[in-house]
Amino acid sequence: MIFDLEKNNFSEEIIYDVCIFGAGPAGISLALKLQDNNKRVLICEAGDENYSEQSQNCYKGIVKGDEYFDLDVTRLRYLGGSSNHWGGWCRTFNKMDFNRGDIGEYLIWPIEKKDIDPFFDETAKIIGLPKPERLNYRESISSNFSLESIEFDYAGTNFNTKYINVLKKSKNIDLLLNANLKKLIIENNKIKSCDIISYNFSTKNISAKNFVFAMGGIENSRQLLWQQKINNENLYDTQIPVGKYWMEHPHYTLGNLVLKKKFIFSPMFERSKIEVGFIQLKHDIQKKLNILSCGLRLEWPGYTNAKQIIADLACYAPNLSKEIFDLFNQNLMCAARVRAAWEQLPSVTNNITLSLKERDKFNIPRPILNWKKNSFDKKTIKATLDYFSQFLLKEDMGRLQVDDWIN
């Protein structure tokens, strides 16, 4: 059932099996699974059923370091969470994603790919992947270079619209809207209950056997740090690096590409539509170059922009540009913008901390995101681009023009 703390229509006095903070993809998925196991669940969603300024305002924060999005732009604070605006790009992990001990021991996960594989089919169904088989697609694109293409599948599932009726009808799940976590009540080193508060300052104490934070990486860290502080550091071991090692998959445009030949692998673009595919270095060459994974995405820029890219090529490769213009006019070549998303090296200085000055409506310190790219980021980008450029030259596929900021 769905209740609203703002309207004072929630009067349940039971002890829930699980109380979940956050009704985004993680919180809703967990609640549905617990419901199937006959558990009584309460989801406390800090926002409303739809977007509201009063809720979204609580997501404002401070960014220090490299330029980044405003923190209230990248996140949405209402039912469905980030699924209300995500693109739904999905792909499976590789075995190597869980173990890059060749770079450092801190890049070895405590779990392996085989530990999550049994949950793939169930997960694909929950998020509505239309063609999950695409995610296993990997194709070598050269016998001489360790390059492969991979595909993404696009769910784009909005957990608000997909599951709201399920939540309304559920007998085991209670969803409480406009319910902001105010304080965890700790007794004998265990969370016994919590105080929640609405925007009109209605309050409620909730008891549960277990509590789950599913508010997203930034908000989880913010609340854990704050709850630890107001509970005299009795919530968790102070040695646990809460808020530390914050990471992003940075997305940047790296340059322009002209192709003399069509690629021989499937997830590529046509002039009429984009089939977004990624090219990445295989793991053997990543290890050899001592870099992390970096996916290159080629985007068809449209006819006019493609001509401009080729025209720019004439400035530094006039002989090649004439050949390419001839192919372009015969519809035999492609131009593209090259974008990348790469994996970052964990850094303890990239973290979430609490502001000493700015607070939200409920007097909770706003988060500070401290984030900077480092020399390893640049090493990963440059090594990937250099290797891809060598492939283009030696296979006589085309030319890559790198943007100035890379160098």
Language-model features and meaning:
Residues 36, 49-50, 184, 195-269:
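Glycine-rich loop(s) and the adjacent beta-strand/alpha-helix scaffold that form part
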Residues 176-187, 333-344, 364-407:
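A glycine-rich dinucleotide-binding beta-alpha-beta segment and adjacent secondary-structure elements
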Residues 24-25, 218, 375:
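Residue-level detector of alpha-helix initiation sites
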Residues 239-365:
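FAD cofactor-binding and catalytic pocket of flavoenzymes
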Residues 16-43:
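N-terminal Rossmann-like FAD-binding beta1-loop-alpha1 element of flavoenzymes
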Residues 1-18, 36-37:
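Extreme N-terminal leader/targeting segments of oxidoreductases
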Residues 102-191, 406:
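Conserved redox-cofactor binding core of oxidoreductases
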Residues 60-133, 348-352, 356-360:
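Redox-cofactor-proximal catalytic regions of oxidoreductases
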